[in-house]
């Protein structure tokens, strides 16, 4: 039978949009701003690291990171993120969302600064310390995924919940753009202050010693906005759903939300008891869980996994793709800072024209169109544009067609973000019960990061030319065939989306069945 709903949860579901909603979006969103900045800014500086630490000036081309080093630098933070999502997701259900929320931010800020301070001047020492700190940076970032999503979903009303969670996630777009802008400004400033010839003109002089400061400043700068929100993150009360349904203190939940909503909220003891008993009857991966949510967990993990293979491949290696099609000039025709400047400019344009608009289209339409159809549409359009890039790939390599390639490439980002990149983050925060919500979101997100790791490590090798691979790499399938693989991955994601339930307009308890009291619970209530 359906149990009566706790009054505090009804009030939250029916609440009009208020100041505390926007505060929650900003506080949680700044974490994602830093997450995206830190995860994606490394792609901007890897070519610079190759020039600084692996250049042999007797060779005709500037140095690049060896394959194993490039994979480690690019992917180590993703490995840390996967571990952090599982650990902090579980911890968020055991200790509370707020209890561990501040720790993740501290870890991100400290490790981000430490990454920029990686010590030594030899390649081994710099890369080793950089990878060490970026792993723990990723560990902190991983915690922000389940905690931010769960906190925002549990604070929001059911009418605007999708838009509010999407708005938190949309800060990722600003983080990517901010990273590109910081790199653009820093490289432009150093390029102006320390002019240098191209590598072809003078290999030794093209590597200005001051360029070593640029990548360090870029890695550290993203901590500032997130650090400013630490105080407010600690001031947020625990979510009412955790306090009432997990910590079993409905009175405290009502008191906390009375202050937030500026209204008196009281709870009936019999309703509280029915909710608590119903929530205690089964655990993660139990038969009852698998019956109610097993297919849901399969849907959220598989779609996020498939999405991140494509999304992170595109994001982390767009600099290589732009070089291959000729949008960025050959490395030897530029000095180290000029190359960083051009890569940053390209990423800023893609973020501004494709990435950010996609996020905010999701914010605008998710509570109108629904999660399911946005995800289906996004995967479908990503498949179409990947094929549009891959089928006539030789056409796009001609200088006259570079602009068309960039436009189509930007559109794949637009429909990733106005599509599965946003919805795979939102849905797991809505469809699982309160006691397991953070854990299940962490599992879903970790599955996504497993896909990202495949994208980060696999695409680097797979996209190598079939006849003329980069130094240190074996022959790959080429960018054209790699685009076909990504198109197939997106198509599989569209098929797996058929398992995703629609949560538009429903309360969290209606989706998770937290307010359903089964026969065992009824007997326990009767005996109490």
Swiss-Prot record:
Entry's induction text: Regulated by the transcription factor PHR2. Up-regulated in roots by phosphate starvation. Down-regulated in roots by high phosphate or colonization by the mycorrhizal fungus G.intraradices.
One annotated Gene Ontology cellular component of this protein: membrane
Pfam families in UniProt: Sugar_tr
Gene Ontology molecular function: any one: phosphate transmembrane transporter activity
BP GO annotations: phosphate ion transport
Statement: the UniProt record of this protein carries the keyword Membrane: yes
Membrane-protein topology: Multi-pass membrane protein
InterPro entries listed in its UniProt record: MFS_dom, MFS_sugar_transport-like, MFS_trans_sf, Phos_permease
Cellular compartment(s): Membrane
Transmembrane residue ranges: 25-45, 72-92, 100-120, 126-146, 164-184, 213-232, 297-317, 349-369, 372-392, 406-426, 443-463, 482-502
NCBIfam families assigned to the protein according to its UniProt record, in alphabetical order: 2A0109 (TIGR00887)
Misc remark: Although related to the sugar transporter family, it does not transport sugars.
Function, as annotated: Low-affinity transporter for inorganic phosphate (Pi). Involved in internal Pi transport from root to shoot. Responsible for most of the PHR2-mediated accumulation of excess shoot Pi under abundant Pi conditions, but not for PHO2-mediated accumulation of excess shoot Pi. Acts as a H(+):phosphate symporter.
Annotated protein name in UniProt: Inorganic phosphate transporter 1-2
Naturally occurring in which organism (per UniProt): Oryza sativa subsp. japonica (Rice)
